[in-house]
Amino acid sequence: MERAYNESSFQFHVLPERASIVTTSSTGTGSGQQAASGVSLSERTAHLCAEAALFMRDHVLSLVSHDLRGPLNAIHSWAYVLERKLDANDPAAQRAIVGIRSGVDQQVKLLETIVDTTRAGTKTLALVREPFALQALFSDSVDEVRTGLARSRGVSVAFESGLSTEQFNGDRERLAAALWLMLTFAVEASANSAKVTLASSADATAWRAVITYEATLAALDDASVPHLLEPFARTQARAPREAGRIAWVLSLCKRVAEAHGGTFEQGEMQDGQASTLALHIPLVAA
């Protein structure tokens, strides 16, 4: 079941550069503004871009919350150590300790009231599970990206399927969004005339989708070609990553995989080298 969104009044506030939104009125007529790149952004694509941006924002907030709490807890603990070492009759020293504790408490409260509250909307990812054909999911995702961004970028998208009639009981729309984002990212990171390949397979326990592409880091920031992902997201994707972490813009893929009891992995991305994006989903919900 595909989630409905208001197509007659859809507003996309985080606009991808070099693309335009084509809105559809209640009568079915389309309107839009052609971008300089010559690419129009359909409402579905705008919706997918907005979803990717939303999950990226929440992923960044999660990192901020996690990475700040450790130092704040350490500061709080060391404040108690200092208090025992300082002269209890020294007003200046006591004011300093109170100020340190107060500052830490304010920062923790800020994380709780702003960061954690902002993330609440996507903290629990609800799934609409229905049986569907895996082969159709993959082929539809490939066609969507192939006829959209890939064609305008001169990138070919191939589909290598090891599937036949396999069915899966899951949230098709969420998984389609994850596959779209994986393919779109691979196209964004590919040079003209490059090839992106989606290989799918399944066994008795799980199904897999592995996207392979040759990374061209300069393509992520090339102003002469169209882009769907935000400039900030593409710039961050080029930065070195700590082990086990993914590019922020791929957060939706990770969340969707985990909600289905599976995993998402991003391979190392080095200029001119083959790189992979992999989705692994168990056939039976965890």
Predicted regions span which residues?
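Short conserved segment of the HATPase_c
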Residues: 220-233
